[in-house]
Swiss-Prot record:
It is found in: Plastid, Chloroplast membrane. The keyword Iron does not apply. Residues 83-109 have a biased composition (Low complexity). Its main location: plastid. It comes from Hordeum vulgare (Barley). This is High molecular mass early light-inducible protein HV58, chloroplastic. Probably involved in the integration of pigments into the mature pigment-protein complexes. Residues 81-111 are annotated as: Disordered.
Length: 231
């Protein structure tokens, strides 16, 4: 009977201990429920006498009651939520930094090109020689054909007139050369004066054809011995 009372009291104590709530901190804590192993030893002595004949014998019985209680740890929900939110929150490195605003570079000051000298303009690769020769060739080709048609003399006869022919040639060459050099020495270009069909490229090609025409005219008259207009 005493054993039952002891067990009942132990069970009541254990039940009340199990029902009592464990107050745990709300944030960043772990709820720990720990119980120990309890061993209950109950000794009971029983005196037995069979029919009163045999001497009484004492029987001692021992009741061992072992209660194994386990320890387990339960994480707090708030701390678990904080851990989850901390793991899912973006790191500062994931934020894209705004690209720096590019400041446009200041325009370089336009330096005025120096005017070429006479020797630069009259150089073999300069702008003056081919253009001046082309203009003189165009004027000479038209003048040679006009004189042949008017007087009947060939190109070689016209060059042989040292008094009038050579004077006209030198005067025409001087005027056209000076008129072509002055704009170049002032820094102007022929391309800046081009408009429509009066372009710099057209003038170059016409001058080249005129130079070839003068050479062909002189060669033809020398071979045939007669002016080109009479052939």
């Amino acid at each position: 009977m005493a054993t039952m009372v002891a067990l009942s009291s132990f069970a009541v104590v254990g039940r009340s201990a199990a029902r009592s709530p464990v107050v745990a901190p709300r944030r960043r804590t772990l709820v720990v429920r720990a119980q120990t192993e309890v061993s209950l030893h109950v000794a009971r002595t029983i005196t037995v006498s069979v029919f009163g004949c045999l001497p009484a014998s004492t029987i001692t019985s021992r009741l061992d009651l072992t209660v194994n209680l386990f320890v387990y740890v339960q994480p707090d929900m708030d701390s678990a939520k904080e851990t989850t939110s901390a793991s899912t929150s973006p790191s500062p490195s994931q934020y894209t930094s705004p690209s720096p605003t590019t400041i446009p570079a200041a325009p370089k000051p336009v330096t005025k090109k120096a005017n070429p000298s006479v020797w630069d303009a009259l150089a073999f690769s300069g702008p003056a020689p081919e253009r001046i020769n082309g203009r003189l060739a165009m004027v000479g080709f038209v003048a040679a054909l006009s004189v042949e048609a008017a007087r009947g003399g060939g190109l070689l006869d016209q060059v042989g007139m040292w008094s009038s022919g050579l004077a006209w040639f030198l005067a025409t060459a001087g005027v056209f050369s000076v008129a072509s050099l002055l704009p170049l020495l002032q820094g102007q270009s022929v391309e800046s004066k081009s408009s429509g069909i009066w372009s710099a490229d057209a003038e170059l090609w016409n001058g080249r054809f005129a130079m070839l025409g003068l050479v062909a005219l002189a060669a033809t008259e020398f071979i045939t011995g007669a002016p080109f207009v009479n052939i």
